[in-house]
Regions:
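Sec/Tat-exported extracytoplasmic proteins
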Residues: 19-20, 27-34, 59-66
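Short Gly/aromatic-enriched secondary-structure transition segments
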Residues: 35-44
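N-terminal helix-cap/turn-to-beta initiation motif at the start of protein domains
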Residues: 5-24
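Calycin-type beta-barrel ligand-binding domains and close structural analogs
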Residues: 5, 31, 76-204
Length: 204
């Protein structure tokens, strides 16, 4: 992933404030045809023009998988060279709204899927390098936990996170209920500069 690395002196409570905003799926945005030339340009700066288009497609493909969890574990065990991450939103959520510890999920029609307040619980293992938050709402179900990577719009131009109701699997990247899944979001009002910057980040 492109993101920042969790650090010992990082403030996970502040992180929940630093990600304030409304987010749509990062790769649904970045994979729009109008940004193809930006991907090629940023890739060319790293690998040269000859291989830029191929590399750009590879970079997009590793984050646009369509399976996760046990289905992905089984599929990639049989064909490890095909392993990619699903970085889309799950659970019927189209947009996420972060607001000082409150997280709200909206569907494609703008209806509220969930709306809970979260508090910091712990730092997850280095393999996932995320901070775990939990709501005390008894009916939260698959939205009981939110795990945030230390990415913010101000630092890496996007956010990376996952959510679920299975505490044991929240910190596992390659096994369990959330294997090969890490949602990625970008501010819904991201301007051309932010999109340019985040594509450059993934191309590095």
């Amino acid at each position: 992933f492109s993101g920042a690395v969790a650090e010992e002196d990082f403030d996970p409570v502040q992180l929940m404030h630093d990600v304030n905003g409304t987010y749509t799926e990062l790769f649904t945005t970045l994979c729009k045809p109008e940004y193809d030339s930006v991907w090629v340009e940023k890739s060319a700066a790293v690998v040269g023009e000859e291989n830029a288009e191929m590399v750009a497609e590879i970079l997009k493909s590793v984050c646009t998988g369509t399976i996760f969890g046990e289905e992905a574990v089984k599929a990639y065990a049989e064909a490890p060279e095909e392993a990619v991450f699903d970085c889309y939103f799950q659970g019927g959520v189209s947009k996420f709204v972060f607001n000082d510890g409150n997280v709200k999920g909206l569907d494609t029609d703008g209806n509220v899927v969930f709306d809970h307040n979260y508090t910091y619980v712990e730092t997850l293992p280095d393999t996932i390098a995320c901070y775990l938050y939990k709501t005390d709402d008894a009916d939260a179900g698959d939205f009981t936990y939110v795990a945030l990577a230390p990415d913010t719009p101000a630092t890496t131009y996007h956010i990376e996170f996952r959510y679920g109701g299975n505490y044991e699997d929240m910190g596992k990247l390659y096994e369990g209920e959330y294997a090969y899944w890490m949602g990625a979001g970008i501010l819904e009002d991201a301007d051309a500069e932010m999109i340019d910057n985040v594509i450059a980040l993934f191309a590095e």
